Amino acid sequence: MASEWLRTRGRGVHLTIRDVDCRDFDAERLAKDLHDLHVNVLSFFCAGYITVHPTSLSLRTSPFLGGRDLTGEIVAALHRYGIKAVAAMDLSLIPETVAGEHPEWRSLDARGEPYRANRDLGNFYIACPLSGYQNEFLEQVLRELVSRYDLDGIKFGGGSYGFTSYGNGICYCSRCREAYRAFSGRELPGREDASDPAWGAFQRWRREAVVERTRFLYRLVKSQNPDLPVMCNSVCFGDPGWTLRGALDIERMAEHIDAVQVEAQTRVRVDGDRGEWQFLLWPSEEANFLTSVSNRQIWVLASYFQAWPWRRNAVPPAEQKVYLAQFYANGGSAIVNLSGGPPAVHQDRRGFAAIRSLYGFVERNRSYYEGDASGANVAVVYSQNTLFYYDREQPGRYVDAIRGMEQAFAEHHVPFDLISDTRLTAEHLAKYRTVVLPCTACMTEEAAESLKKYVENGGSVVATFETSLYDPDGRKRDDFLLADLLGVSHADTLQVTGREDGVYKQAYLNVRLGDHPLLSDLGDTTVIPAANRYCRVRLRGEKAAVPLTLSAAFRVFPEGMSYTLEPDPGDPMLVAREHPSGGRTVYFAGQPDLAFLRFGYPDWGLLLTNAVRWASGGRLPLEAEAPPTLLVTLRKQENCRLVHLVNLNGGRRMFRQMIPARDIKILLRSEPAFRPRRAFLLSNLHSLPLAEEKDGVSVRVSRVEDYDVLVFEGDADSR
């Protein structure tokens, strides 16, 4: 690591300084208020389209600055309170005066016309990441900052990495044309067209260019000061629009960054009379994924305000606290994006209570947030190639399949890691009992071979829908690459309701083996709803159990004619195999993961969870008897097991008041090298009775209001 402070979890705020804030900015009061909020890291925009210090460079300084060196004032004040100062910059926008001097720095459309940032701004152009503005000129900006201020880090805004900013499309400037020609031997595509095979090649170039861009920025900072940490701002797959248009591969980018920051800002995006809510578990998703694929310090940025569009109003404290707590429950650190001025002058100060409460809790108990690692033995796989090249017209469906798994496991309290398909190697898979493939369609032969060997060595695999049916470039194969492993061959992909004929229809999964463990706790029913598409498959080999088959579809209306006399066609919808090694495989021919996220019928979540429990042979490290709205994660330290409890039961969002979770039972399964001797909650440190169970120890927690951590402390000789 580049600096000692990166070795510990942080409690951050990011401040976007507006022009008008410079008029009466009180740096000393800012530092004091942040200290009172238990903040130990502040990043703040100081250079770019708004610069808040005197400069000899062609940067736009705030008209309200009045000759002040606000950057210097902030850094000095922060250090007086022991807060780290990270200077952030965003050179994605070029002021008109600078663009006039260097028109070659602008990003161009196919007609050679420059892209303008939001036209109402009027005098800003969008910079190409390959241009001199974000390269040679950036070096001068950086040199000025590093030589002048005692900074603890440099952070580059999101516009510094990706190839889209403020709505621009493909850049046709000379540097982009030359770079793409050298990469592919082709000219740039004429338009964005996900169905065009050439688009895939273009996206691969952009992905490589973004990684190279990340490497360049890292080296640039280190050339100025080898010990100065570099932070980024990007996003994981949970925002597919930004990920795809920006060609962002955060896993590879993280290799060239000291501290990785990704965003989970959006709560609900309101546009006119329409509103779209973001996934409530998005904070967990991002922290979980990045801590699984990177050994860098992980920051996840969430808005203080109600994004989007209300930058001035705070997220209600009840929701904010449990939203931010998810970062810490999954190994990350929270950084709150503050817009609208420093805390003392903010128009809505109601949200600061949540930050003070959570950050104070983390600070008081910081030893339990250091040196921890995930205790999960189930891995859910994300595939960058599947997002980019599989369902190109609706990539959100793939993300929703992953999130359906996340939602099911969260509701049933199954600890899991989100890993990349690049981790499908013997070394990385060794720590997992079960690997889950939610429609991991684009799969390499190397990954498939690793999974086969994994099962041969006793591991288990759960897969859904078109997993392994496509190559890494999105070309459809004749059969599943995992056909032998899963025991099925692909025949066709169809709607569960059959061909479209104008009749509103329904279809079901018929229960065929009601006593199979995969159908445990299903209750007194012989049918389960079937939704979306499915793969018609043929069984391969013997010794496969088929607990569910697809019914014939039939009409919904009129009710008196809503039935079918057609026989069950017998298409397998759930296929389970036990392998000689002791490993198990489960294949869902349909899309229960996607359906569970979008429509929420509980049977789908139960089936997915049963699949993991059965595949894992009952060897999950933790079991919880708790409401489905209590998020439970497991972290490990050398002599502790840490069960993070995040209560997400606040009724209708945005949460105004949390409904406490009560009478929770946590069973920690026995480990050969760890013997619990004491259990307590970090909120009060009072010891809780340990009850010996057949395969571990259990504890009862009477109440969780919003966020707490249950600590199992081991014997002194536990290792």
Residue ranges and their predicted role:
Residues 1-52, 56-88, 374, 631, ...:
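Mature N-terminal, pre-catalytic/accessory segment of carbohydrate-active enzymes
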Residues 20-36, 134-145, 242-253, 316-324, ...:
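Short, acidic/polar
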Residues 30, 35-70, 93-111, 163-175, ...:
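Aromatic-lined carbohydrate-binding/catalytic grooves of carbohydrate-active enzymes
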